[in-house]
Structure formats: structure tokens, C-alpha cells
């Protein structure tokens, strides 16, 4: 991108083009529920039309669930706010038991983004990140998915940011889910 405005424009165009797509990861949320039984606050980043939030609300009915979407379409969907997921919000720091995203590959600044997300985890919180095999191979990035790399390189990236990968699950139709924790917390 030549600048941040172009990034937002490209992400918004992609969002509007894919707005009719349904969230494909219902089985992902079911698995998350088996490894993280309890959660009071859940945040989902890059949620397009809010399918993630609906699934989390189904499995954690008493939890506060919110999602972020950079596009101006965010206000059309319940439990969704328009927000660039890489931008820190003070009220979200150390606030969430679960952070979920299948959109990390959309990051404008991956280093800033992952630090923001790490800081949103409450004590004992878990970050669940989808990483999609072929779609994330080195050299596969494009204007709508600017971050790519092998799973091995992605895990190295997380470790460099003091994010500990606790579990990997690839028993899904598409990609992997990594369950992570803030490696700087003393839990």
C-alpha cells in the first residue's frame, strides 16, 4: 500500500465484495469451547458480517461478545463495531478471556497488530488464530491479504512477540487454529 488510507480502502472494498459470505468456522468455535470452557468477555477481529460473534454467543450465552470490522458496513451487524483491529483501545487492554480472528493476514502492520491483540488478553485469556494453509504461503499475499507465510514462520513470528502457542488444531476443512497465550503473563 502507498499509505494507510489505501489499506482501509482495499479492505473496505473486499468486505463489501464478500459481504454475502457466511462465517465458515462454526466447527472452530465448537472446538474453542472444548479447550476454553469459560469466558466472560470475547472479542473477534475482522468479522465482516458478525458470524463469529453469533457462534460465540451460542456457545457462551452469558458472555459479552463484540467484533470489529474496518468497513463502514460494521453498523449493519449486531455485536459489531467499526474499528481497525490493530489500533489499541484503552478500555480493551487486559479485558478479554477469548480473542479470535481469522483475519490476521489482513493486517496493515503485523507487529503492531499482534502486540495490540496480545495486550487485550485478560489474565488466563487465550488468543485463537486461524491460519489457512495455501492461502497463507510465503509469496501469496495481495492487496486484501497482505500478510502471508508458512505455519512454521507464523509461529516463529508469534514467539518473537512473546506469544506462546499452546495447541495447534488442523482437524478442520480449512487451515489451522492456534491457541495461544501471552507469554509475558505469569499465569
Task: Briefly describe each language-model feature range.
Residues 87-99:
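A short acidic, Gly/Pro-enriched loop at the edge of an enzyme's catalytic core
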Residues 41-88:
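Class I SAM-dependent methyltransferase SAM/SAH-binding core
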Residues 123-135:
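Conserved beta-strand signature within the Rossmann-like core of class I S-adenosyl-L-methionine
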Residues 111-126:
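A short glycine-rich, Lys/Arg-flanked "PGG" loop and its adjoining helix->strand segment in the class I
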Residues 161-187:
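Core SAM-dependent methyltransferase catalytic element
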Residues 134, 138-167:
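Conserved Class I S-adenosyl-L-methionine
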Amino acid at each position: 500500500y502507498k499509505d494507510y488510507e489505501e489499506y482501509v480502502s482495499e479492505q473496505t472494498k473486499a468486505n463489501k465484495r464478500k459481504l454475502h459470505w457466511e462465517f465458515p468456522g462454526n466447527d472452530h468455535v465448537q472446538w474453542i469451547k472444548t479447550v476454553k470452557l469459560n469466558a466472560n468477555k470475547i472479542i473477534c477481529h475482522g468479522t465482516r458480517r458478525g458470524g463469529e460473534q453469533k457462534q460465540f454467543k451460542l456457545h457462551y450465552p452469558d458472555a459479552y461478545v463484540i467484533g470489529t470490522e474496518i468497513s463502514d458496513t460494521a453498523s449493519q451487524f449486531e455485536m459489531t463495531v467499526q474499528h481497525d483491529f490493530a489500533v489499541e483501545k484503552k478500555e480493551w487492554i487486559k479485558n478479554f478471556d477469548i480473542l479470535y480472528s481469522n483475519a490476521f493476514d489482513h493486517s496493515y502492520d503485523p507487529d503492531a497488530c499482534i502486540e495490540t491483540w496480545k495486550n487485550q488478553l485478560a489474565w488466563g485469556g487465550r488468543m485463537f488464530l486461524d491460519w489457512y494453509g495455501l492461502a497463507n504461503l510465503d509469496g501469496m499475499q495481495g492487496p486484501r491479504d497482505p500478510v502471508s507465510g508458512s505455519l512454521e514462520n507464523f509461529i516463529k513470528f508469534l514467539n518473537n512477540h512473546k506469544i506462546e502457542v499452546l495447541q495447534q488444531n488442523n482437524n478442520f476443512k480449512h487451515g489451522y487454529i492456534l491457541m495461544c497465550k501471552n507469554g509475558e503473563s505469569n499465569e
